[in-house]
Amino acid sequence: MTENITTETRPSIYGLTRDQLIEWAIENGEKKFRATQVWDWLYRKRVQSFEEMSNLSAVFIDKLNEAFILNPLEQVVVQESADGTVKYLFMLPDKVMIETVLMRQSYGLSVCVTTQVGCNMGCTFCASGILKKERDVTAGEIVSQIMLVQKYFDERGLDERVSHVVVMGIGEPFDNYEHLMNFLRVINDDNGLAIGARHITVSTCGFMPAKIKEFAHENLQINLAISLHAPNNELRTSLMRITRNAPLEKLFEAIDYYTETTNRRVTYEYIMLSGENDSPEIAQQLADLIKPRNKLSYVNLIPYNPVAEHIKYERSTKDNTAKFYDVLKKNGINCVVRQEHGTDIDAACGQLRSKQIKKNKAKLA
């Protein structure tokens, strides 16, 4: 796998799985246990440089420095919310920027990672797609987001660790499938960060139903979420243009294949847009769509975070959201209204990045 696609000629070592690191070490004249030592320094001791790996020879450290960098991300902006949510803006070696979000949950620290610089999916309500995709984020750069968030707590002497990960940041994860899978295997490794598969969720808009089928055979018990947002093709196409090429019939054929293959539940994300997709009639359509597969389904109703560039959309009222929820519950649909995080900072995914890029352009003008 080609890990590096930036101006930095060396890839991040975080992009290697443990088996890949062992293979590299042996190819470079080192014993297998040396790679295991490096892995331990990276993920258990969480050092910030190869020079800190005190049980390695100077020759081996030189080899590591010649072949890899550690963390390729530079922290640009940090926004902290009153509820404990932290939003980070990171710069990559080629000066493009990505967002990462830490959310404090009752069950631990959850991090939302970004998989692409910009997004081409064209969802009309989303801040992430305002700036189009420039490139994929490499596996090492995705892992680095987790490592820098963990460093944030380590440096403050806080005995807390990242325990949950959601792949719901900027970009479409299944459009960066190879790097996504390497990232998942790195963070799920029991000898490393050891983030349990059932504590990891990957979200897709379903633009490539075939990838959902492929994901079913990865032999990982990672949670799958579908960005649905509408129960019929006409409405969904108006909100998500990818529906033209991946209509609901194709999407749900792939979802049914996934659930039959894995026997794992699928979460459906549904953003509540006032006057667009929040009527009781639409709720009944959604219930009718989910009901045949309700045993392995869960609907997540999401309050909309307004985006300046998308002024036509407003958040559903609490009353309309409650009525929508009630229709689903009366139909026996497993559902919840998502708890909000970070409402006093740039809450919408992609908003912080968009603002910073505008600031940078204004400085150059």
Curated annotation (Swiss-Prot):
Residues 105-344 form the Radical SAM core domain. PROSITE patterns: RADICAL_SAM. Binds 1 [4Fe-4S] cluster. The cluster is coordinated with 3 cysteines and an exchangeable S-adenosyl-L-methionine. Its cofactor is [4Fe-4S] cluster. [4Fe-4S] cluster binds at C119, C123, C126. It catalyses: adenosine(2503) in 23S rRNA + 2 reduced [2Fe-2S]-[ferredoxin] + 2 S-adenosyl-L-methionine = 2-methyladenosine(2503) in 23S rRNA + 5'-deoxyadenosine + L-methionine + 2 oxidized [2Fe-2S]-[ferredoxin] + S-adenosyl-L-homocysteine; adenosine(37) in tRNA + 2 reduced [2Fe-2S]-[ferredoxin] + 2 S-adenosyl-L-methionine = 2-methyladenosine(37) in tRNA + 5'-deoxyadenosine + L-methionine + 2 oxidized [2Fe-2S]-[ferredoxin] + S-adenosyl-L-homocysteine. Keywords: 4Fe-4S, Cytoplasm, Disulfide bond, Iron, Iron-sulfur, Metal-binding, Methyltransferase, rRNA processing, S-adenosyl-L-methionine, Transferase, tRNA processing. The keyword Disulfide bond applies. S-adenosyl-L-methionine binds at G171, E172, S203, S227, L228, H229, N305. Belongs to the radical SAM superfamily. RlmN family. The active site is at E99 (proton acceptor), C349 (s-methylcysteine intermediate). It comes from Lactococcus lactis subsp. cremoris (strain SK11). Reaction proceeds by a ping-pong mechanism involving intermediate methylation of a conserved cysteine residue. Disulfide bonds join C112-C349. GO terms for biological process: rRNA base methylation; tRNA methylation. Its main location: cytoplasm. This is Probable dual-specificity RNA methyltransferase RlmN. GO terms for molecular function: 4 iron, 4 sulfur cluster binding; metal ion binding; rRNA (adenine(2503)-C2-)-methyltransferase activity; rRNA binding; tRNA (adenine(37)-C2)-methyltransferase activity; tRNA binding. The lineage of its organism: Bacteria, Bacillati, Bacillota, Bacilli, Lactobacillales. Specifically methylates position 2 of adenine 2503 in 23S rRNA and position 2 of adenine 37 in tRNAs. It is found in: Cytoplasm. The keyword Plastid does not apply. GO terms for cellular component: cytoplasm. InterPro entries: Aldolase_TIM, Methyltransferase_A, RlmN_N, RNA_MTrfase_RlmN, rRNA_lsu_MTrfase_RlmN/Cfr, rSAM. Its EC number is 2.1.1.192.
